[in-house]
Amino acid sequence: MKKETQTKGEVTRLAVEDAAISLFLEQGYHATSMRQIAKRAHLALGGIYNHFSSKDEIFEAIIIDQHPYKKILPLVLAVEGETAEAFFRDAFRIVIRELGQRPEFINLMFIELVEFKGKHGSIMLREIAPKVLPIFRKHVKKMKGLRVHNPALLMRSFFGMIISYFVTEMIISNSVLSPLMPKNSADAYIELFLKGILKEPA
């Protein structure tokens, strides 16, 4: 959303969300108060309650308003792989590239999992699933070579691969394992997702 198209209220909401993101990443969700968020956003404490009733509502708004999936989804929907393999390779590269440009959302994901037990994930899925699930249904019906025939399971495993890629990338980075990894670990990761670790019997 461009600044010139935003109302004053929308600009204020986004300022509150940006302030909250920075504080959540600096000191954690539970250690951050509404007063601190208001101060960081240059608002009076009463002013913040004109837009959000609670800190939880701010966190939920961040997930809905600012998550990179809003930019990623149209790019993935535009992928036209002739085969399932081509589609998943292209889609994975797009997601990794775009999420890699917003590392703060990977850290917010940890806050979501640890402090909220993933409850906001269901909110995000309400928006994502109706748009993404038809893609997986199409590939299950149309493309040969798939061993998984449940579209929801296929979508879950694809999302799981993306999350595990970023989690392990953070852990392995600058560790003793880092120099032992393939030069392009993302390509190696999608290869494992597509073909597994076992060779086909001769």
What are the residue ranges of the model-derived segments?
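C-terminal peripheral helix-coil segments that are non-catalytic and often amphipathic
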Residues: 2, 97, 101, 133-142, ...
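Helix-turn-helix
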Residues: 15, 19, 23-57, 61-62
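Short, charged helix-capping/linker segments at alpha-helix termini
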Residues: 30-31, 145-149
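Residues in soluble alpha-helical coiled-coils and helical-bundle/repeat scaffolds
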Residues: 39, 50-57, 61, 82, ...
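Amphipathic alpha-helical linker/stalk segments
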Residues: 62-91, 136
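Helical hydrophobic small-molecule/effector-binding pocket
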Residues: 64, 86-111, 159-166
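Amphipathic alpha-helical packing segments from all-alpha helical-bundle domains
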Residues: 70-71, 118-145, 152-153, 167, ...
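Short secondary-structure transition hinges
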Residues: 97-135, 178-180
